[in-house]
Structure formats: structure tokens, C-alpha cells
From Swiss-Prot:
The gene is CYCLOPS. Highly expressed in roots. Expressed in root hairs and nodules. Not detected in leaves or flowers. GO terms for biological process: arbuscular mycorrhizal association; nodulation. This is Protein CYCLOPS. GO terms for cellular component: nucleus. Forms homodimers. Interacts with CCAMK. GO terms for molecular function: protein homodimerization activity; sequence-specific DNA binding. Residues 447-513 form a coiled coil. Disruption phenotype: No visible phenotype under normal growth conditions, but roots of mutant plants are impaired in the interaction with both rhizobia and the arbuscular mycorrhiza (AM) fungus Glomus intraradices. Stunted growth when grown in nitrogen-limiting conditions and in presence of Sinorhizobium meliloti. It is found in: Nucleus. Keywords: Coiled coil, Nodulation, Nucleus.
Length: 513
């Protein structure tokens, strides 16, 4: 099969001359890079996140995979085939003795050799015809893909194809990689696994850009390498691909929550004491971060009366802590002896006040009984303090919500202004009248009766004026209606005269006939 493949390559005289110059030159062709093979985005795909990977795949691979790059790749694979076939053993031996950089170039060289050797599995026709057919087919498929409108089903299909490209590639002819040392391949695996938190993808799972455009047919007349797809768990690969994005989203959500909590603390926010957050029976009280002050003191006490004294000292009153922003964690003593000490050791008593802004990082193991005692006693004390502070806040709010009548500050909302404005004006008027009555000197009874009569007369005059204005408005409307009726009457009179003239004319015409 390889003999027929090499004989087919020598049909073209230009290629024969090119191969002769390559074989006779002492330096030879340079090792082809991944960019020459069309895998430019493979080395960069691990450093970007999932959305950038997908967009770059759409722009560079789906649309930019044109005929010129495919023709160049196929020409390079054919022209370099004899050089790689003749010098593969020497290159493998040289690579095995060198460092990590040469190992990477050896991997690329082997990958190119596999690509070239797989071309010989099919009967080779004229190379020009093969290049023209491949370029035409790729142009047609690229035009068909770019011409379609980006709908929801189209987007899902592209993402499914992108996932398959990331997860599968046909490993053909990888037996030539056995010369690579085992520790060097493990080193390359570790380097690939460190890119942006992605899991390791072996050379078998590297994306094949040709395989994304062709269907896996088994016909011998196919012009492409029909790669066999390797099934990989799609769920795990998608999770590993989106791990970086999810971690960034989690960090952003955590930052937003902390900012919101800080904003609420500035107003006033009482929090429950931190006796939760990752307490397990099998593990110690982990994952708590002490930020500010830890005022605990630990003593060994033999007298049980000290327990009551310490509990009594924690029953303090927090009257001035209305603007308390830190989380208060009051812990009472744990009466259980330490497990690491002997049974005759005295119990360790720990009491105090921890001012924390986050969970403290103390590795403290609590039993079930001590946990219940600490939780109940501290919750009762903090609940009493909290109720007292909330009562103070309610009093402050009531004091602020008083309306302004004279000298009291007003805190009325805009919605109640319309309802309270009338009552306020009436109350201010009554207060002014009462003030005038208090300021005016004493008047005899007859004068007071006269003044009262005058006030009543003023009210009657005011009402009469209102009635007169109403009547005038009514009169104006009636006069307008009368004028309209008079105008209509004049129009009807004119119409009547015109009709009479018409009747007379008709009668005169009939009399003449």
C-alpha cells in the first residue's frame, strides 16, 4: 500500500524535483508546527474560557476554514511524506534523548506522520483533482453553514458539534509515539491539565478540524480521512470545560452578597450568632475565619461555683449598641474534659465575646451535650439583647414619624399630603382663632353679641355671593341658548321665504303651459 502511495506521488515532475532537493539537502525540512497543520487555535483554547472558545471556534474554524488553508495542508502533507517516512526513526531517537521542548515537537511530528500515513489507506488519484474536489466541497459546506440564519436550533447544533470536536478525534497511527519516554508524557499531561483548571485531554481527544465538516463514511472513493469518533463522557467534558466560568460566577455572586450585607449593616442589621456553618459529627468545627478580636480566656477551674459566676457576668445590657454591625458570638464554658488529657484533668472553661465579621477559623470540636448548652444559653441571652435593641429602634421610628403641627418635625409621605392638608389647614385656623381670642381683651356681653351677629352676617353674605355667581352662570348659559334659538328661527324664516318664492315660480310656469 505504501509503495503504491509513493509511486503516485512521483507522477508530477515538479513534485519529483522538490522531493529530490529535500532529500539531497543536508538540513532538510523543518519540523511542521501545529499552525502549518491548521491547528492554530488548539494551543490557545486551553487559556480562554468556554464562551471565548466557542466564539473563536465559530469565527476561525467554522467560517475561516477555507479552501486555501485546506489546499496548503494537503500539499504539505503530501510533499513532506517521503521525508518523514525516511527520517522518522532518526528523529524519534533524537527526541528521546532531548528535553521537554523536543518532546512537544516530537508529538507534533508524530501527529503529522499519522495524518500522512492515513492518506495512504485510499487509492491515490491525481493530486490536483483531489485538491480541487476537497476545496470545492469545503467551500460548499462553509457557504451552507454561514448562509444559514442563527436560530435556537442552529445554535444548539453548533454547540453540540463544538462539544463533539472537543471530546473526540480518531487516533490513527499513534503507534509511532511509543518512542517518547513515559515521564516526559506525564509531564506534558500535567502541563495541559494546569491550563485554566481544565482536565487533561490526551492527544486522542484533541479536536480534529477536518472531522467537523465531513461525515464518517466508509467508502473507498472518499477524498478525506474518515476519522473514527471516540466516545467520551459528554457530561464530564462539558463540566470540565465550564469549570472556570462557573467558579468566576460563584465568586461574583459571593462578592455581591457581601456588598449587600455590608450595605444592610450600615443601616442596621442584627444577625443570629454563628453556631452553624459546617458542623459535622465526624469532623471538627471547621471553616470559620476569625477576623477581628478574640477575647477568650481559658482557665482550669475546680470549683463549680465559678461556672455560675461566669454565666452571670455575661448577662450584660447593651443599651448603647443600637448601631452594632459586627456579629456577636458569646460562648459559655464547655464542662467536658479534653479527650487528649487524662480523666482526672479539670474541665476547661472558655467564655468571652468574639467580635467577628465572618466565620472564625477555629478547629474546635464540640460534643452534642456541650453544643446544646452553648447554643441554648447564648441564644437566650442574645435574644434578650436583640429584643431590647429592637424596642429602642421602634421608639426612634415612632419619634421620627411624628407630623409637624407648629414646632414638631414632619415625616409624612407624599401620598398622605392630600388627605392631611385639609385637616392641617383647619386645625391651624382654629389655633389662630383661639390665639386671637386669648390675645384680645375682655369685651362686654352686648359687644360680643354684636360681633357674633356680624360674623353670621358675613357668612350669609358669603353664601349669597356664591348663589349669585351660580345664578349668573346659569343666566349666561340660558342667554346663550336663547341666542342660539333666535338664530335658528331666523334661518327657518329665510328658508320659508325661499320656499314660497319657489312655489310661486312653479305655479306661474304651470299657468303658462
Amino acid at each position: 500500500m505504501e509503495g503504491r502511495g509513493f509511486s503516485g506521488l512521483y507522477k508530477n515532475s515538479s513534485e519529483e524535483l522538490f522531493l529530490k532537493t529535500v532529500m539531497e539537502s543536508p538540513i532538510g525540512m523543518p519540523v511542521p508546527t501545529m499552525e502549518m497543520l491548521g491547528f492554530k487555535t488548539v494551543s490557545q483554547s486551553f487559556r480562554t474560557d468556554s464562551e471565548e472558545l466557542f466564539k473563536r471556534w465559530l469565527t476561525n474554524d467554522q467560517e475561516g476554514y477555507n479552501s486555501s488553508s485546506m489546499g496548503l495542508n494537503s500539499r504539505l502533507s503530501k510533499r513532506i511524506s517521503t521525508e518523514i517516512a525516511n527520517m522518522s526513526n532518526q528523529q524519534h531517537i533524537g527526541v528521546a534523548s532531548e528535553g521537554r521542548n523536543n518532546d512537544k515537537s516530537c508529538l507534533q511530528n508524530n501527529f503529522l506522520a499519522n495524518d500522512v500515513s492515513s492518506d495512504f489507506n485510499f487509492p491515490i488519484r491525481d493530486p490536483v483533482d483531489r485538491e480541487l474536489q476537497s476545496s470545492n466541497l469545503f467551500l460548499a459546506k462553509a457557504w451552507f453553514i454561514t448562509d444559514q440564519r442563527m436560530t435556537r436550533s442552529r445554535s444548539s447544533e453548533l454547540r453540540r458539534r463544538y462539544t463533539e470536536m472537543q471530546n473526540s478525534q480518531a487516533p490513527q497511527g499513534l503507534d509511532s509515539m511509543f518512542m517518547v519516554p513515559e515521564h516526559d508524557t506525564n509531564t506534558i499531561k500535567e502541563e495541559l491539565a494546569n491550563f485554566n483548571g481544565f482536565d487533561y485531554l490526551s492527544m486522542c481527544e484533541l479536536p480534529s478540524q477536518k472531522g467537523t465538516f465531513m461525515s464518517p463514511s466508509n467508502s473507498s472513493s472518499s477524498t478525506f480521512n474518515t476519522h473514527q469518533l471516540v466516545d467520551v463522557d459528554k457530561v464530564s467534558s462539558c463540566v470540565s470545560m465550564l469549570k472556570g466560568t462557573l467558579q468566576r460566577k460563584k465568586l461574583e455572586c459571593q462578592v455581591e452578597k457581601e456588598a449587600a450585607e455590608d450595605g444592610l449593616n450600615e443601616i442596621f442589621c442584627i444577625r443570629e450568632p454563628l453556631f452553624q456553618s459546617a458542623f459535622n459529627e465526624e469532623e471538627s468545627w471547621n471553616q470559620q475565619k476569625l477576623v477581628n478580636v478574640q477575647g477568650d480566656f481559658t482557665d482550669q477551674v475546680n470549683d463549680p461555683g465559678v461556672m455560675q459566676t461566669l454565666e452571670g457576668t455575661t448577662n450584660f445590657v447593651l443599651d448603647g449598641f443600637a448601631n452594632q454591625t459586627n456579629q456577636i458570638q458569646g460562648r459559655t464554658a464547655s464542662g467536658e474534659p479534653s479527650q487528649s488529657e487524662s480523666s482526672a484533668a479539670a474541665p476547661v472553661i472558655s467564655s468571652g465575646l468574639d467580635a467577628c465579621e465572618g466565620p472564625s477559623n477555629s478547629n474546635q470540636t464540640l460534643g452534642d451535650s456541650s453544643w446544646k448548652q452553648v447554643g441554648e444559653s447564648t441564644q437566650n441571652k442574645v435574644r434578650g439583647v436583640r429584643e431590647q435593641i429592637m424596642d429602642n429602634l421602634k421608639d426612634d421610628r415612632k419619634r421620627k414619624s411624628l407630623e409637624r403641627y407648629g414646632s414638631v418635625t414632619s415625616a409624612v409621605s407624599d401620598g398622605k399630603m392630600d388627605n392631611t392638608k385639609k385637616r392641617r389647614v383647619e386645625r391651624s385656623r382654629k389655633m389662630a382663632e383661639a390665639k386671637e381670642r386669648n390675645l384680645t381683651p375682655t369685651i362686654p356681653s352686648d359687644m360680643q353679641a354684636i360681633l357674633k351677629r356680624c360674623e353670621n352676617l358675613e357668612k350669609e353674605v358669603r353664601s349669597l355671593k356664591l348663589n349669585l355667581s351660580f345664578m349668573n352662570r346659569k343666566d349666561s348659559e340660558q342667554t346663550k341658548q336663547i341666542e342660539d334659538l333666535q338664530k335658528q328661527n331666523e334661518d327657518l324664516a329665510d328658508e320659508k321665504e325661499r320656499l314660497l318664492e319657489e312655489i310661486e315660480r312653479i305655479l306661474s310656469e304651470t299657468g303658462k303651459i
